Amino acid sequence: VRAVASSKPEPFVRKIIDRFGFTDAFDVICGSGIGDELTKKASRGQKAEIIHKAMGQLSGNGNAESLAGRTVMIGDTNYDILGAKANSLPSVGVAYGYGSRQELEEAGAEKVADTVEDLRKLLLCGER
């Protein structure tokens, strides 16, 4: 895991990640603007843009497309899955988060993990 692309306002995302001691695990942390969260613009209309921004920053040259073949979006809502699709990324839904398995499948997640262990197996071993 190298990047976070969250619909939460970026300052809050950074605080949450820091609180749990994961700051050093990520090269890039992107979130929405404070006003976007208040209008729900980020979760509905900007998720794809936030993902694209994170990929551009992660690439080091602003070229998000250069990472497309080496990137997977892991998310717990339909917005995450739809944002991945908008960026031509494969996606894994995590049903132990905010959204349900049904929501993730209906949004088009290629795979859904019910537990952290399931996610680990999917990512490291290619298991379903």
Predicted regions and their residues:
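Short secondary-structure boundary segments
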Residues: 7, 33, 95-97, 116
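Generic C-terminal helix-cap and adjacent flexible tail
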Residues: 61, 120-128
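Acidic, Mg2+-coordinating phosphoryl-transfer loop and its flanking beta/alpha structural elements
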Residues: 73-113
